[in-house]
Amino acid sequence: MGKILAICTSPRRGTLKTPVPSAVLAPEWGIVGDAHGGSWHRQVSLLSAEKIEAFRQKLWVDYGAFGENLVVEGFDLATLPVPSFFAIGDAVLEMTQIGKECHSDCAIRRQTATASCRGRAFSRWCCAAHHPHRRRDEAAAHPGRSAPARGGDHPFR
């Protein structure tokens, strides 16, 4: 059983995200109010808290510094296949991509002058939001809520 430690959003792409107390996950959109919400395959990004903690041994960064929407703990994202599915309350996130390469104008690179966040070992996991029963409904996400991973199990069968 995994757990959400932080939810982070930003109104513009290419900027650091900031923690928020809660968010609304809209089906086929992602996090309402976040710049990456929309009709595409990378609506929500996950990053493991363990990867952030390892980076913090070198340099302190806040949650959201790597552009992640959800900071999660309790499962090894690197071992999950694409697609994998995460239940968060009534919402379902489908892992659509492992990793997102850091670009040359990356906000964390500008802040730290390093490319230490590159590579699969530090990848964000990109997801699309779904609702298992009522696709037009929205589900709230809150830090501390359990998020069980269901690797490879499609919830819409």
Describe every region a protein language model picked out.
Residues M1-R157:
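Metal-cofactor-dependent catalytic cores
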